[in-house]
Amino acid sequence: MTRGLLGAAALLALAGGAAAQVDTTARDTTARHDTTAHRDTTPAYLPAFAAARPEGPLPRGTRYAFPADSFAFSNAQTLADLLAHIPGVYVARGGMYGQAEVVLYGGRGPAGVEVYWDGVPYLPLGRDSVYLDLGRISLAPLERVDVLVLPATLRIYLVTARQQSTATASQVRIATGQARTANYRGSYERRWRSGLGLSLVADYNNNDGVSGSSSTPFNSVDLWLKAEYLPTPKVGVSYQIASSSWKRSPSDQPGLTDHFAYKRRDGIFRLFAGAREDGLGPRLDVAFVTTSASADTAVTGRSLSQGALALGNRWGHGHVGVTLRSQDEDRPWQLEGSAAWIPLRPLTLAADARRARYSNSRNGERLHLAAGLALPLGLTARGDVAWAHDLQAPALASDTAQRTTDISGALRWDRHRITVEVGLARRDSFVPLGHPAGLRPLGGLGPTQATRYLTVHAAFEPLPGVHFSGWYFDPSVSSGNDFEPQYHARVSATFYSKFWRVYKSGIFALRGEIAMDSWSRGTAGLDTTGNVLALPGATFMEVNVEVQIAGVTIFWIQRNMNGMRGGYVPGLDYPRRYQFYGVRWLFTN
């Protein structure tokens, strides 16, 4: 009782003291609020459009992936340079940078290459509505290139930059070299926390060519702009504009290089809606594309539009999808389907099919099946079957469907520092149509024989930072097919190190590479009068050195360093010891 009274008295005393200390001063309502508080500038990583590339799972070794470092920190200057790393690819170059670069694969002419820009077919348009000049597709807006290799076809998926961080990123590149080569490139990428994004890339190239050769003066301007809005990972919308304009001057000697002025503009609208934030489950994709080609005095301007509606479903061990496309009058509609599945852990199955309707009541079908099996000791076996009864150039009214069945298989061995793959394939005969407009002496390709061929691909790292890689291609026919000489190989040796013991922060990197592309004698199609062109054997070497310090990269590249007299196409020579060098700056925030 006494303790309770004492406690109550103590509380009353404290309360009285506190009341005596109450501040009775009137509040100053004119005082300004503290504005020194900083807003949250910590970068946030936001959702982005899923990369439009082949849906997996796929058998190991069927896909080649080239991330941004593959063409930003390497000797690749064009898309064709990247594809030269794939066994069996022949790049028919009209000369130095700026001249035509036509990728030939599988003896199928224009049907050997399919290109998709963010999942949308990139169709040839303009003076050449059959072949794509891959040297004129700028790498500047791209963050990734995936290539799905079929027995006689390359499906190339180009993925544009997808900025996810709210930290603003920008890049500047300046390069110069022989023939008054000049390259200026700039990019700016920004994402806001609301989900809004803006990306801009500008790329300017110019050179004065080499007098008296097929390497004539060239100038190009590539612009790319993309705006996107992804309020949640489940839904998003984007619109991008890709504009490319270039001019190639005629050669001093008639019949080598024609005057070629060209401007292409693509507008791509995309929308997606998914059921889950992790990208699994049902998903809807919609795309609408407009493309125009102009500025060429040799042909009238032309435009086309495309629409696509895709429905798919992904889960942990597979996917299934169907796409309906409506394209130009030459391709009224296409229905595509794809599926992949891992029924058992060592087994992977994949398939895709297409049914197409073309102008003049023509139809086309194709089917591709693939399987892969993981074996002990790091071995993997895979096989592909591609059947088609399809057109190769729907823009040509004379094109008719050709029936082909192509089969390939490979055995791959992967260890920690070594990869070896040996493949065999059989392709049906084929008659390519048309001729590349940028390769003036080439009047077309001759018929391709039914061919069996051997490919070998290997990569080896004997020491940390030291890499050897290469491939070998051998068609088992006595004379070879056009641009498929009996022996063709590419090898390279690369040194790459960040010198961690000296630069512990990782601020420094050094890369050096020497590569060689060599082939034996063969045939190179037909000239403009129908006579067979002989392809001389040749060896071209190149060297690349790059030094990276933080966000600055200094590079030097020399092509045809061994001074080879000749070229990749008969009659079109390649400059000897052509070199260019420059610097790239990468800024963040």
Predicted feature descriptions by range:
Residues 120-149:
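Short acidic/polar hinge/loop motifs at secondary-structure boundaries
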Residues 42-56, 63, 80-121, 159:
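Extracytoplasmic beta-strand/coil segments of soluble accessory domains associated
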Residues 283-291, 300-589:
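Exposed, low-structure sequence patches enriched in small/polar residues
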Residues 52, 79-82, 101-104, 116, ...:
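N-terminal periplasmic accessory domains that precede
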Residues 59-60, 143-144, 151, 160-181, ...:
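Transmembrane beta-strand segments of Gram-negative outer membrane beta-barrel proteins
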Residues 152-156, 163-223, 235:
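Outer-membrane beta-barrel translocator/receptor signature
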Residues 22-74, 162-166:
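N-terminal periplasmic "start-of-domain" segments of outer-membrane beta-barrel proteins
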